[in-house]
Amino acid sequence: MSASKEVRSCLWTQSLRRELSGYCSNIKLQVVKDAQALLHGLDFSEVSNVQRLMRKQKRDDGDLKRLRDLNQAVNNLVELKSTQQKSVLRVGTLSSDDLLILAADLEKLKSKVTRTERPLSSGVYMGNLSSQQLDQRRALLNMIGMTGVSGGGKGASNGIVRVWDVKNAELLNNQFGTMPSLTLACLTKQGQVDLNDAVQALTDLGLIYTAKYPNSSDLDRLSQSHPILNMIDTKKSSLNISGYNFSLGAAVKAGACMLDGGNMLETIKVSPQTMDGILKSILKVKKSLGMFVSDTPGERNPYENILYKICLSGDGWSYIASRTSIVGRAWENTVVDLEQDNKPQKIGNGGSNKSLQSAGFAAGLIYSQLMTLKDFKCFNLIPNAKTWMDIEGRPEDPVEIALYQPSSGCYVHFFREPTDLKQFKQDAKYSHGRDVTDLFAAQPGLTSAVIEALPRNMVITCQGSEDIRKLLESQGRRDIKLIDITLSKADSRKFENAVWDQFKDLCHMHTGVVVEKKKRGGKEEITPHCALMDCIMFDAAVSGGLDAKVLRVVLPRDMVFRTSTPKVVL
């Protein structure tokens, strides 16, 4: 690897860490807990056997079965795991241009990974030849005098790399890759040290990783303080190895998980609710730094690596979890849908919720959505954390509601079709600037369902509490306590432009012109009021500045808007 490529990889990694910091978490305790479970429950004699078979020049179906069986045993013992999740990316948080970029890069990544797994070695294409074919080819090449190109002995110089001779190559998928908990357990057990010694050694390695990618010289110096690190093999490739190998990559990944507050990419957890936001942030860094999918087969660069890991499973710990139960590859498990535009469609008065209900259509939350809301944990909101709330519209007829927690960056944001159209048009002109047809696709019943799901005796902070209090009381939530910061209009909105500049992509519903009447006559155009943006700017006003953290939407889009037109049941 050239020096320029190392610098670029480091820059890409650091920039991705900054942009995705809001999706990172502290997982040291969970990793150590899984390592303890492996130390007590895993058969390390079988671990030793799998390490042995991974050193073989050729491996067969029997070897693969042993690897898969041991991987399944590990999967059964740990809690950090990714689950099978088919993700479909559509226009919403991601723009149509974003989707085109993702589709193209996933296709390039597919091509690169395919070429890497069937590599060129010393100029000779191996293909997917069986052991018998490789032996036959070696004999033929020896016969014609090409003994140094494609012999079957040890070492890469003879043109033969370690190969799996198996009937079904798909069974190899997702059986490799490293897990910090497994690396930690293997170092502890096979290095015959205390678990805490291994944790301390990996923590120091992780601290170096926050500034640069550790190399063999760094490891040698660190091994003087932590002899257990002598087990790490810096010459071992990170390609096509099992989680039981002591590669430098495996140790560095484990070290990243030992840091609390390091904003390491290895600690990202993806869910159906956060996937679009994560990909949006990745594309932002790609655009600013010119990141790309390389045509050269081999190890993945930071952009290729995070794109593959996020798209492999839309539910779980993308870098560090057990993924042995996942079927398929990243480009199979994440599909880009360029056909459907999921923005709320202007379908006219005939498509409003009231018209649908009068025509006999079922308009409202379906059972699975109600069950999701019933468990407040699904909100990802912390019950006792500072929570802002704001509404647009009248308390008896709200059209937009937002809840925002600055500590986590999580927010709930949804809309409602108004019943008083005349009052709505007045409010649109002087406050929120919405088009009523954009609200016809709003999911009915969501306001009551969300307010009902809020924890009892919750404390909510707001700027102006009267309307919010009336709304909560109308839903029977007198137990919720309100803190009104009562700032002046100018003070509460002093970060308005900064908030809209930074977070404008979070809401596209304010399309109209809003005016404000002046005391001495005349009118002046102002920025439309958005419940979510107001929550963010009110918090900035109280805190004295705007936090640059990444915000995470809680409610999936299909819960906020109806994504398809109901059908009449005949």
Curated annotation (Swiss-Prot):
Mn(2+) binds at residues 390, 392, 534. GO terms for cellular component: helical viral capsid; host cell cytoplasm; ribonucleoprotein complex; viral nucleocapsid. The record marks 467 as: Important for exonuclease activity. One of its GO terms (biological process) is negative stranded viral RNA replication. Zn(2+) binds at residues 400, 507, 510, 530. InterPro entries: Nucleocapsid_arenaviridae (IPR000229), Nucleocapsid_C_arenaviridae (IPR035084), Nucleocapsid_C_sf (IPR038115), Nucleocapsid_N_arenaviridae (IPR035083). The keyword Endoplasmic reticulum does not apply. It is found in: Virion; Host cytoplasm. Residues 54-241 are annotated as: Binding site for the cap structure m7GTP. Keywords: Capsid protein, Helical capsid protein, Host cytoplasm, Host-virus interaction, Hydrolase, Inhibition of host IKBKE by virus, Inhibition of host innate immune response by virus, Inhibition of host RLR pathway by virus, Interferon antiviral system evasion, Manganese, Metal-binding, Ribonucleoprotein, RNA-binding, Viral immunoevasion, Viral nucleoprotein, Virion, Zinc. Belongs to the arenaviridae nucleocapsid protein family. The N-terminal region is important for the cap-binding activity while the C-terminal region contains the 3'-5' exoribonuclease activity. A CCHE zinc binding site is present in the C-terminal region and may thus contribute to the substrate binding and/or the specificity of the exonuclease activity. This is Nucleoprotein. The lineage of its organism: Viruses, Riboviria, Orthornavirae, Negarnaviricota, Polyploviricotina.
